[in-house]
């Protein structure tokens, strides 16, 4: 376990916000959690779990303890002719795990290449891209309650997964920190190519689908649309794509015939938040050190020196204008930390 005081966070969040935390703790195993449970100072402090800082926005310095997983490793639990069950440490970099799966011919997560963050965060956020959500592959989440020390295995159904949602986002589950995630990956060739943008590139460039070619293509597409946080601070998609009723969508389509849409199984319709933002004139918008990325309106950026409150203010401005124009309220996918 590694403990640091008055710790700078500019390199611990992909927005590059220059906040600080009173305390930063890296944990590597169950024994570290056991120590923290017995520590009176820790138990008296405000605690927030954090991964790679790729889906959050610091609005101010954090007064308390940021708890960060350094639990690593991949263990094979079971293998049959169709699938393999892997237990992965929550502190492993997500894209390193994707690369490992591709190298070992394990199918299922290749569409999720280059998504920033850790393995633990994948289970919290239910990350998704190009027609795949990680909840389709998660079998169980192993967690510890950092106040009581309780250990619990959350089966997939216990996590209540939905679009960009899991039970771990609820306040009642905020004190659970993830140790390991179990993923069941396929051993037989099987690809998810229903997503139009991905399928179009593969077809136009006559790319034969393989694990590596799909991973490479996804990485290329993502790099063409999203800025590198090492160069321009950002948290990827800032807003959740809104889901509206079929009736609401039909009304919008009458006024905006070119509006993109993704019909959902329950009859509702998902509308790209980036398209809504772009129609409000924000694509490429800049106000001082903050702005909207020129190649993807869903991405808010820090050009250097911006504060979290400045980014948040731009987000609220966008929310207001989208609501006024379309009657749709956007919700941040990024978590605000006060």
From Swiss-Prot:
UniProt key word Iron-sulfur: no
**Where does the FAD-binding PCMH-type domain lie?**
17-188
Q: Which domain of life is it from?
A: Bacteria
The UniProt entry's GO CC annotations, sorted and at most eight, read:
cytosol
Instruction: Determine if Nucleotidyltransferase is one of this entry's keywords.
Output: no
SUPFAM superfamilies given in the database record: FAD-binding/transporter-associated domain-like, Uridine diphospho-N-Acetylenolpyruvylglucosamine reductase, MurB, C-terminal domain
Q: Indicate the family of this protein.
A: Belongs to the MurB family.
Q: What does this protein do?
A: Cell wall formation.
Q: What is this protein called?
A: UDP-N-acetylenolpyruvoylglucosamine reductase
């Amino acid at each position: 376990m590694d403990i640091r005081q008055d710790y700078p966070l500019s390199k611990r969040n992909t927005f590059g916000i220059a906040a600080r935390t009173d305390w930063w703790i890296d944990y590597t195993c169950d024994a570290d959690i056991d120590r923290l449970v017995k520590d009176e100072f820790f138990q008296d402090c405000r605690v927030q779990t954090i991964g790679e800082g790729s889906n959050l926005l610091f609005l101010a310095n954090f007064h308390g303890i940021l708890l960060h997983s350094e639990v690593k490793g991949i263990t094979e639990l079971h293998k049959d002719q169709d699938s393999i069950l892997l237990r992965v440490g929550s502190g492993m970099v997500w894209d390193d795990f994707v690369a490992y799966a591709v190298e070992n011919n394990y199918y299922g997560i290749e569409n999720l290449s280059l998504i920033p963050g850790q393995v633990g965060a994948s289970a919290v956020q239910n990350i998704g891209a190009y027609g795949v959500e990680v909840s389709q592959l998660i079998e169980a989440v192993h967690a510890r309650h950092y106040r009581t020390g309780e250990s619990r295995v959350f089966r997939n159904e216990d996590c209540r997964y939905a679009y960009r949602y899991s039970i771990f986002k609820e306040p009642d589950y905020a004190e659970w920190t993830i140790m390991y995630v179990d993923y069941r990956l396929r051993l037989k060739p099987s690809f998810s190519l229903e997503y139009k943008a991905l399928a179009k590139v593969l077809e136009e460039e006559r790319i034969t689908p393989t694990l590596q070619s799909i991973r490479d293509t996804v990485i290329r597409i993502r790099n063409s649309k999203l800025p590198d946080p090492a160069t321009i601070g950002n948290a990827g998609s800032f807003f959740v794509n809104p889901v509206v009723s079929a009736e609401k969508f039909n009304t919008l389509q009458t006024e905006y015939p070119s509006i993109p849409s993704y019909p959902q199984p329950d009859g509702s319709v998902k509308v790209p938040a980036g398209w809504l933002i772009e129609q409000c004139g924000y694509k490429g918008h800049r106000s001082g050190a903050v702005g909207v990325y020129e190649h993807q309106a869903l991405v808010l950026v820090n050009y250097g020196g911006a504060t979290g409150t400045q980014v948040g203010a731009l987000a609220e401005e966008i929310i207001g204008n989208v609501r006024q124009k379309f009657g749709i309220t956007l919700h941040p996918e990024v978590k605000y930390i006060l």
